[in-house]
């Protein structure tokens, strides 16, 4: 009886696998068990409905295995992470590794081309042993820093030149305005001088007389008639000033010392020798 029950379980499970697309809840397990019994058996059914839970567990396990295999087959074409023991999964993993290798080759080729371009842009060094990727990137970084500093210095110089240009433009505008004012003033002066030349000449004479010294001379036309008339006296003719230098009588022999001067004989003092030559009394 137990062997017949096990055989009935196997047959029922095979039928359930054939109709796996159906839902378990919609299955009539009683009908399946009744149809699974052979016509020559002594009992009408091989097992009763108490084995329904066991059949449900077997069928759910089979469905889980089928879903797992289908998910592995679908994901193997997009990524190489999941691994399935079925042959389609292994084939998809090989394709994914090949695609990954091709992508890696392309990436390395692009990186090599970028390094060659960078080597042409960055100034080279004399030491050939330092031409590594790290050394190239270091030199490129230093070169970029130098370019940034140079650009900052050039921008500062440009700003200074712009400020100086603005100052020069403002100074030029001020000079032009001053020149216009000077021209307008000169034109106004010329207009006034043409309208009143006599007044300008008199004002110029008064101004020049104030600025420069003036020597007054006797002029009968410029003096009133009742003023005292000055007289011109010739000092030389009148004998008030001698025509030659005043000299005193000197001794014939110069003394050598004070004692010789004291021992000189007395001479008569003549006052007329000290008077002017042309003195008239």
Swiss-Prot record:
Forms heterodimer with mxl-1 in the presence and absence of DNA. It is found in: Nucleus. It holds the Pfam family HLH. PROSITE patterns: BHLH. GO terms for molecular function: DNA-binding transcription factor activity, RNA polymerase II-specific; protein heterodimerization activity; RNA polymerase II cis-regulatory region sequence-specific DNA binding. Disruption phenotype: Does not suppress axon regeneration defect in mxl-1 mutant background. Suppresses the axon regeneration defect in sdz-33 mutant background. RNAi-mediated knockdown increases lifespan, which is abolished on an mxl-2 or mml-1 mutant background, or by simultaneous RNAi-mediated knockdown of daf-16 or pha-4. RNAi-mediated knockdown causes delayed onset of polyglutamine-mediated paralysis. RNAi-mediated knockdown reduces spore levels of the microsporidian pathogen N.parisii during infection, further reduced on an mxl-2 mutant background. One of its GO terms (cellular component) is transcription regulator complex. Expressed in intestinal cells in adults. Expressed in D-type motor neuron cell bodies. It comes from the Eukaryota. GO terms for biological process: determination of adult lifespan; regulation of cell differentiation; regulation of transcription by RNA polymerase II. Residues 71-80, 200-212 have a biased composition (Low complexity). Residues 71-105, 189-213 are annotated as: Disordered. Transcriptional regulator which binds to the E box motif 5'-CACGTG-3', when in a heterodimeric complex with mxl-1. Involved in the control of lifespan in response to dietary restriction, the decline in protein homeostasis associated with normal aging, germline signaling and may overlap with the insulin-like signaling pathway. Plays a role in autophagy. Involved in promoting infection by the microsporidian pathogen N.parisii, possibly together with transcription factors pha-4 and zip-10. Transmembrane segments: none annotated. Residues 95-147 form the bHLH domain. Its main location: nucleus. Residues 109-147 are annotated as: Helix-loop-helix motif. Signal peptide: none annotated. Residues 144-185 form a coiled coil. Residues 95-108 are annotated as: Basic motif. This is Mad-like protein 1. Keywords: Coiled coil, DNA-binding, Nucleus, Transcription, Transcription regulation, Ubl conjugation. Ubiquitinated.
